[in-house]
Amino acid sequence: MKLSEILKICSGNEVADFKYSVVCGNTDADVTGITSDSRKMQDGYAFVCIKGAVSDGHKYIDQIKDKASVIVVLDGEYEAKDCKTAVVSTDNTRLALALMSAAVYGSPDKKLFTIGITGTKGKTTTTYMVKNVLEACGIKTGLIGTIETIIGDETIPAHNTTPESIEIHQSFAKMVDAGCKAVVMEVSSQGLKLDRTAGIMFDIGVFTNLEPDHIGPNEHESFEDYLNCKAKLFKQCRVGIVNADDKHTQDILRGAICKVESYGIGDNADIKAENIELLHEPGKIGLTYDCTGLVNMKVELNLPGKFSVYNSLCAIAITRHFDVDEEALKETLKHVKVKGRIELVKVSDDFTLMIDYAHNAMALESILTTLKEYHPHRLVCLFGCGGNRSKERRYEMGEVSGKLADLTIITSDNPRFEEPEAIIEDIKTGIAKTTGKHVDITDRKEAIKYAIEHGEPGDIIVLAGKGHEDYQEIKGVKYPMDERVLIKEVLEELKGN
C-alpha cells in the first residue's frame, strides 16, 4: 500500500483526529509493513518513533533509515538531513502507530463485530463468557485479554492486558482470515491511555466497575486520570453497555457519543438480576437468579458471588445484540470456566477447592468475603506474595486473610530475587494484627498437599495468587509450575499412601 493511501485512511478515521505534515520524501513510496521496534525493522516498513519511559525511537533513526519507506516522528524531535526516505511529523506518534497499523493490515477492525470491555474487575471472566456464548451459537469469535489471545484454534500467551496497536490489528487480520465474525477484548486503562485501541470504533463498549487501582508513577498519576482513560472507550463505540450500580458510571459516560444500555441489581438497570439464591454442595458452588427487563430468563451459574452475577448480566446484555438462542445462552453460562478465575478443581466429595488469581488485598478481600456468604465449615486461604514488589501488599494481604479466613497457609508465589522466607515473614506481620490462625509452608506444592490432606467436610479452600500462571519465577528464571499439575501430583501421592 502506498504511503499516500495510508495517510488518507488515517486522516479519514471517524473517531480519531489525526494531524500530520510531510517533512520530506515521496508519499508514493510503497509500505510493506510497520513497526516501532528497530530490531523488527525490515525493508519497506514504516518506522514509527515512540518516546517511551525507557527508550526513545528517535534515537534509532540512523540505524533503520536505509530500510524504511517512511519514518514517523514527533513534531520537533527530528531534523531530516536528506530526503531519500519520507519523513512524516505528527504531535502523537502513538496515535499514528494505531491508525497506520489498521491501514497496513487492511482495516480488519471494520470486518469484525468489535466488543471492548473496560473496568477494574470482571473483564477477563466476561470476555470468556461472551466468547463461549457466541461460539455456542455458531458465531466464530476471537478473544484478546489478560491471559491470552485466541484466534480459532491458536492461542498466544499475553504480555499485556491490551497489546500494542500493531499486535491488535495483526491479530484482527488473522481473525478475519480464520473466519471470525466477532472479537471480544479487554481494554485496559493503560491501553486507552497509550492509544493502543485508538481509531477503533467498537460496535459495543462495556464498563464493568471502577475502584482505585493501577495508580502510581508507572501507571496513572491520579484516580481522575484512571477514570478519564476508562471513559475514552465511550467516545469510540456505537453502543455503551454499563453497570448501572457503579457510582462512577455517570462520570465514565460524560462526553460519551454512544447509545447507552445498562445492567445491574438495582431498579434502574435495563437488564437486572432478581431473586438471587446461593448454591453450595461439596465440590460445587454457584448461584441462580431471575434475569428481567430487556431479557427474561432463569440463570444458573457454577460460579460464586455477586460479582459473578454482574459478569453474567454483562455477558447477557452484550450477546442480546446477536439474538442468541436462549437455551444455548443458559447452558453456556451454567458451565463457563475461566482458567485461574474462581476455577473449581475437583479433589474431594467432602470439600471444595478452587484456584483464583487474587494477587492483591482488594481482590483477596473480594473473593474471601464472597465465599464466607456460603457459610463453609472452614474457609482456608493459601497464598504467597511476589518478590521485588511492594511490602505493603504483603502486610495488607496478610491482614485480609487473617481477618476473613479460618486458616491461612502462607507459602511462596514468585519470590524473584528475594528469599521466600523473608516474604513470608512480611505476610505474617499483617496476620499478626488479627486473631487468624496460620501455618507456613514455603514449598507451594507441599502447601497444597497440606491443604488437601487436612481438608475437612464442608471446607472451601482457595489457592490464591497464581491463577492462570504456569510458572514460578526464582532468581530471574521462570520454572514450569501449574497449580493444576501440582494438585494432580498431590492427589496421586496421597492415593499411593
Predicted regions located by residue number:
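Phosphate-binding loop of NTP-binding sites
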Residues: L7-C10, L95-G240, A244, H248-K259, ...
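Short glycine-rich anion-binding loops that position phosphate/pyrophosphate groups of nucleotides
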Residues: G52-V54, S189-Q190, E211-H214, D246-K247, ...
